[in-house]
């Protein structure tokens, strides 16, 4: 693994960890400003550094990176304007995309998972991504309905 790839992976994992803490804050009503800042910075950095890998045409990774940056721009705007619901949904959506990439990369790089899905198009990958979508959608729904977190 190159130094750049290792850097990209580390900031991605830090962003995912911070994102989970941020979601906990949404659910518990805690603002956690340092975790929010770390999540936004690391997740933006992850998306940006993803564009510095060798270009082989438009790939799902490039599309996810673009979508993620648009969502993160919305999160930053929502934070500055104190749009609580928009901030919650955009942060959880950005975390969803980060974890989705983690799932795909795990099936590509971890030998035991790769044996289950050598092409990445096997049903097990779709099941994992579908389960992830359900979990993050439920977390967003609970966070919005609970109204524990406010940007005021």
What are these regions (language model features)?
Residues 1-113, 117-152:
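Polytopic transmembrane helical bundles with strong interfacial aromatic enrichment
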